[in-house]
Amino acid sequence: MSEIVKTFQGSSVHTKRKEQEIGGLTKMRFNQFKSPYFKFNNIYVADVFSGTGRNVIIDEIVDGSPIKLIEGVMGANNRNIDVNFFFSDVRTDACEQLHKYIVERFKISIATNVMLASDAINMLGSILKSNPNIFLYLVLDPNGPKDFPKNEVHDLLCEFPKRIDVIPNISATTINRCLGARDKAGRQMQGWLANIENFDEGFVSSLTMKGRCGWIRRPIKGDRFRWVIVPTFGCFKPKNNWEKQDYVDLNSEEGKETVKFYCGA
């Protein structure tokens, strides 16, 4: 097994749970995509903050979102749709490590692209424009708010609202990573979500515009990092009730109050 590259990225005790839920959501969606009423025959599964594919939490190694995405797609047992994986990160060493780990883990080779998240989103937009039969399944797990491609994703959703699932994963550690250090004073960052380029103003609403729908995860009691996952869907609204997993409808009153909570209201 190759050695893990030491890169500048954070994690918390909730990282394992978050990564597992990415895999669970992916498997759920790809089981849905088996329906004959799903009209797209090619899906791009993208993570534009892919990292190394592994997180170190104390003395435990936890698989990251790219690995959980691959597992979710393979676990859905859906062989009727062509799937292309698109992984990118701004760090060359992280991309190299991820490529090696995927080969070791799955015995397949998937290209990893060294680029800014904003450039990756623009490239994915060009891919969508090139073929009307392509659907995009996009995970956003940013390294820092300055890198978060809010405007690019918004523009993409305006142009292709029915052809994209967007699953943002945001935590307070993104703010700390951007600042270059954790909050040594121990202060809780009440408004961290709003600080991501006014994440709540325009972006959250764009996730469910033009007939789109989505969920937001209820806050975890005692989670000082305040991470949240906001899975949103372009078509085929999931029939599964994930309320037992603490997801609520993003457009419901509870969903709106949850957004306010994460924005420090």
Where do the PLM segments sit?
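Basic, amphipathic N-terminal segments that precede the first structured/catalytic domain
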Residues: 1-19
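Rossmann-like AdoMet/SAM-dependent catalytic core
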Residues: 192-265
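Short amphipathic alpha-helix with an adjacent loop that forms part of the alpha/beta core around
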Residues: 121-131, 154-157
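Short, conserved loop/helix-junction motifs that constitute active-site signature segments
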Residues: 76-80, 130, 156-161
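Conserved beta-strand signature within the Rossmann-like core of class I S-adenosyl-L-methionine
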Residues: 162-177
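SAM cofactor-binding core of SAM-dependent methyltransferases
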Residues: 24-123
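A short, conserved alpha-helix within the catalytic core of class I
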Residues: 145-156
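Conserved proline-anchored active-site loop of SAM-dependent methyltransferases
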Residues: 44-56, 133-147, 168-171
